[in-house]
Swiss-Prot record:
<keyword id="KW-0418">Kinase</keyword>
<dbReference type="GO" id="GO:0005737">
    <property type="term" value="C:cytoplasm"/>
</dbReference>
<dbReference type="InterPro" id="IPR027417">
    <property type="entry name" value="P-loop_NTPase"/>
</dbReference>
<dbReference type="Pfam" id="PF02224">
    <property type="entry name" value="Cytidylate_kin"/>
</dbReference>
<keyword id="KW-0067">ATP-binding</keyword>
<keyword id="KW-0963">Cytoplasm</keyword>
<keyword id="KW-0547">Nucleotide-binding</keyword>
<dbReference type="GO" id="GO:0036431">
    <property type="term" value="F:dCMP kinase activity"/>
</dbReference>
<dbReference type="InterPro" id="IPR003136">
    <property type="entry name" value="Cytidylate_kin"/>
</dbReference>
<dbReference type="InterPro" id="IPR011994">
    <property type="entry name" value="Cytidylate_kinase_dom"/>
</dbReference>
<dbReference type="GO" id="GO:0006220">
    <property type="term" value="P:pyrimidine nucleotide metabolic process"/>
</dbReference>
<comment type="similarity">
    <text>Belongs to the cytidylate kinase family. Type 1 subfamily.</text>
</comment>
<protein>
    <recommendedName>
        <fullName>Cytidylate kinase</fullName>
        <ecNumber>2.7.4.25</ecNumber>
    </recommendedName>
</protein>
<dbReference type="GO" id="GO:0036430">
    <property type="term" value="F:CMP kinase activity"/>
</dbReference>
<feature type="binding site">
    <location>
        <begin position="21"/>
        <end position="29"/>
    </location>
    <ligand>
        <name>ATP</name>
    </ligand>
</feature>
<dbReference type="GO" id="GO:0005524">
    <property type="term" value="F:ATP binding"/>
</dbReference>
<keyword id="KW-0808">Transferase</keyword>
Length: 219
């Protein structure tokens, strides 16, 4: 059996990291840096739900029409030319993500991506528990709703997008509730995952914490 240290540093070996946590907890920043450090493909699983949400809006599909949403999820194709970083799209994505058949359909694509990509770090809500339960390293990142709302607000402001902090806070609280209470793939740490609360940590400190954890696991 190939040891974890070899998997991490030998780019000829398969190496998978699952990176889970609630919205705006710092997963994206950490994931991109770790991907570069260990020569991994980085994939944000929420993009498939945002793409589906965009398609529902574009095709004027009422998301309360469960059968129509499920049918659309079976033929999903990603369009990299679309800006999906929109709070309205994110809110709809959160609502349709609670539909079990939608998650099952989209997870088939994610599971296949993990299996066919030798070196990958996949970010999401249920990667370590459902999509990649056999990941070599499992990380769960969290932070208080207020801190996460501030981060999302600053991200959107930096992109020149109009947003209201109080609305973002309420959206995050509601998304957390949906994520934790859904029947399929609820948000929770995978067994054996490294759990880190980033509420009082900067992006650099978060990366240092995770990197130190990885170093301890592979030495």
């Amino acid at each position: 059996m190939i040891d974890l240290k070899t998997k991490a540093f030998d780019i000829a070996q398969n190496f998978t990291i699952s990176l889970d946590g609630p919205a705006a907890s710092g997963k994206g920043t950490v994931g991109l840096i770790l991907a570069k450090k260990f020569s991994l493909k980085y994939f944000q699983s929420s993009i498939v739900y945002r793409q589906l949400a965009f398609n529902c809006i574009n095709q004027q599909i009422d998301i309360t029409d469960i059968d129509a949403v499920i049918a659309l999820s079976k033929e999903l194709k990603l369009d990299n030319n679309i800006d999906l970083e929109n709070e309205d799209i994110g809110d709809i994505a959160s609502q349709i993500a609670v539909i079990s058949d939608v998650r099952n359909n989209l997870n088939e694509n994610l599971i296949n991506l993990v299996k066919t990509t030798p070196r990958i770090i996949m970010e999401g809500r249920d990667i370590g528990t459902v999509v990649a339960p056999d990941a070599d390293l499992k990380i769960f990142i969290t932070a208080s709703p207020y801190v996460r709302a501030i981060r999302r607000y600053n991200q959107l402001q930096a992109k020149g997008k109009t947003c209201i902090l109080d609305e973002i806070i309420q959206q995050i609280i509601l998304r957390d509730k949906r994520d934790k209470e859904r029947k399929a793939g609820p948000l929770l740490p995978a067994l054996g995952a490294f759990i880190i609360d980033t509420s009082k940590l900067s992006a650099i400190e978060i990366v240092e914490e995770v990197t130190n954890y990885i170093k301890n696991k592979i030495t």
